[in-house]
Amino acid sequence: MDILLQVNPFSSVCGFICHHPCESECRRKEIDSPVSLRQLKRFVVEHTKEHRVQSRKKAASTTGKKVAIIGSGPSGLAAAKDLALLGHQVTVFEKQQVLGGMLANAIPRYRLPLDALHEDIADILASGVEARTGCEVGKDLPFDQLRSDYDAVLISVGLAESSSLPIPGVESKGVLLGIPFLWDTANGFAPEIGDRVLIVGGGNVAIDVARTAKRLGPSTVYMACLESRKEMPAWKWEIEEAEEEGIVIMNSWGPKAILHQDGKTCGIEFKRCTRVFDENRRFSPQYDESEITTVEVDSVILTIGQRANLEFIKGTPVAVDGGRLVFDRETLKTSEAGVFASGEVITGPGSAVQAVATGHNAARVIDHYLKTGEVMKLEPTTLETIGELPKKTADKAKKFDRVEVGLSAAAERVKDFAPIERAYTESEALAEARRCLACATGAVLDPKALCAGCLTCVRVCPFGVATVDQTAFMPAQECLTCGLCAAECPAAGIRLGRFATNNMKEGINLILEKMDVSRISRPFVVSYCCLYETTSRKYLRPQTEKEIEESGILRIMAPCVGRLGSLDLLAPFELGADKVMVIACKEHGCFYTGAEELLGRRIKGVRQFLDELKVGQNNLLFFPTTGSAEESWPQLWEEARKAAAQADAAQSGS
C-alpha cells in the first residue's frame, strides 16, 4: 500500500475507474491475457485501510514558500500532496463545497463510490494540504490578489463545462448538456428526461451520460455519434457494458436539427456522416445530406466536447487564446511568471491517472521554481523496457485463466447507482497474483561462479531459454523466473532477482536464533510449502514463537518448492529439525513444466545422502497438496508428526 500511495495518491479511486493502460503492456498477454493489475491494486487498497489511516502524517512546512492551487481534481490534489511533502505550504481553492472536482461531482456513483474518493482526499489533507472550499477565484477572491499572496500558483481547473451545438432547435426545452446533467444527477438533482432519451457523442463522458440516464428510468436510451464503431473514442469495455444495459448506439450519424413542438423537444434529425477525420487525422467531418434519419425522443443530451471555465483570469497577464490556456508544454508555465498549469485544462479530456501524472510533473517544476527562481524543463520520461515476450517462450508457458469478477447483471445494475463491480476475494487475488511472470527478475549467472559450461541449465529449462557459450546465459527478456536452473546448478552459481530460495538456511536460522529451541514440541518439523497453493493470507503471515513451539512445525513459504536446491533440503537438519517436509502443488498443478519431476529427483538424491549420514531417508517427506492449503496442510503436518512419533517409539523399543 505504501508503494501504491507513493506514486498515486488516488489509489482508491483508480482501483475503481482506472482504464489500466499498464495491463496493455503486461507481457502475460503474449501467453493468455494480462494480469488484472487494477483489481489487484484495488484489493490491496481495500485490505489496508487501518494501516493507511495509521500511516497518515503531516509534513512539516520547511521552505517558507506558499503555493496556491486552483481546482481540486486529481491533478491539483496530486500536485498539492507532492508540494506539501516537499516542505511547502499549500492551499487548494475549490469553488464547490466539496473537494474532488469531476470525481466528486460528475463521475457516476455506479463507477466510483464516494467513500473511495474520500479515503484518498483524507490522505492528501493529512499530509498538510489546506483546502478552502466554496471559494471561487475571480469572484470571491481576485486572481491578482491570489498571485500576490502566494509564491506560485497552479491552475488545475479541469474541463468542467460542456460544449453545445450550433444547430436548429438547440434552445428547445428538453435539450441538456452532458456535464451539468452528470453534475446534477450525482448531487441528487436529476432532471426530468422523459421516456426516450438520446445522447449525442461517442466518448467516455457520453457513455457515462447514457448509462446514468438509463438509471433514471426511461424505456429507451440512444447514443448517436459521428464515429464508426471502430473510431469511437470511448473505451471498448465501456461501450460493451452500455450495450449490455440496453443503450442503443447509432454510429456514423451527425445531428442536423433538434425537432420541437410548442418549444418542447420531440425528436432529432440526423444526416449520415461519411468521414470524421481527414487524411492527416484532423477533425474534418463530411456528410451525405441525402441520407437522413429521424428519431423521436423526449430529451437530447449533448456530450460532444468539454471546455474549461477561464473567466477568473480574464484581464490578467495569464494569456488565453481561443478559450484555451496558453502554456509551455516543456515547463508547464503560463504567460505569467510563477503561474503554472496542469491537468485536463492543458491536456484535454483524459483519465484520472493521466491527470495525476501531470500533477506530479507540475509539483516538480514548481518545487524547482520556488527553490531556484528558475523554470525547469521537464525531460521526457524514459523507462527501461524488457521488450516483448518472444513467441517461442510464450508458447511453452502454461496458460492460466485470468480471474474475472464480472459485473452485476445488467438488468439489476440499471435499477440504481450501486457499484457494478465487486472487488476480488482473498483467494481470487492470490490466484490472479500468481499469474505474474515476475519479468526481468529471472536467472542470472553470478560473475564469481565457477561455471563449467556443463549444460545442466540448458537441459532443465522448461522454456528453452538458457544457452551456454563458455558460460551460462539466460536472456532477461525470455526468462520466466522458474528458478529450476538455479536449483539444479552444480556450481550453485545461478541467482534469481526475485523469489530466490538459495538463502533458506539463513532465513530459517534467523527465526530459530530468536527462540529457545528446546521449547519446541518434538518431533520438530520444518515444512517447505508452496506459496502458490494458498487461498488466504493465513499462511502468508509469519508464525509466532508460541505457534512454532506448540505445533512443532516451522512453516517456510517457498515461491514454488521446485526452486528448492539440495542444500535447501538439507539445511533444516543441520539447524536441528527432526524432519523436513516438502508440500508441493496439487499433482500436475505446478506453474512450471517439469518442476515436479526435477524436484522429485532432487529429493531422491538427498534421501540417499541422508541414509549415508545415518539420518534416515524417511525423515525427508514429500507430499502434493490434496485440497486447498488451508484444509490439507494441517492434515499432512499431523500425519508427518504421527509417523515421526511412531518411528521414534519403534526405535526406542528396539
Model-inferred region functions:
Residues 66-91, 206-214:
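N-terminal Rossmann-like FAD-binding beta1-loop-alpha1 element of flavoenzymes
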Residues 44-60, 122-139, 162-216, 320-335:
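Glycine-rich dinucleotide-binding loop and its adjacent helix/turn
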Residues 171-194, 278-349:
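FAD-site-proximal beta/loop scaffold in flavoenzymes
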Residues 209, 342-373:
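A conserved FAD-binding loop/helix module that cradles the flavin
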Residues 1-8, 15, 21, 40, ...:
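N-terminal Rossmann-like dinucleotide/flavin-binding domain of flavoprotein oxidoreductases
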Residues 92, 96-127, 131, 183-185, ...:
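Rossmann-like dinucleotide-binding cores of NAD(P)H-dependent redox enzymes
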Residues 1-2, 15-44, 91, 95-98, ...:
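Iron-sulfur cluster-binding cysteine motifs and their immediate structural context
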Residues 41-66, 103-104, 108-130, 139, ...:
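Flanking helices and flexible, charged tails adjoining ferredoxin-like Fe-S electron-transfer domains
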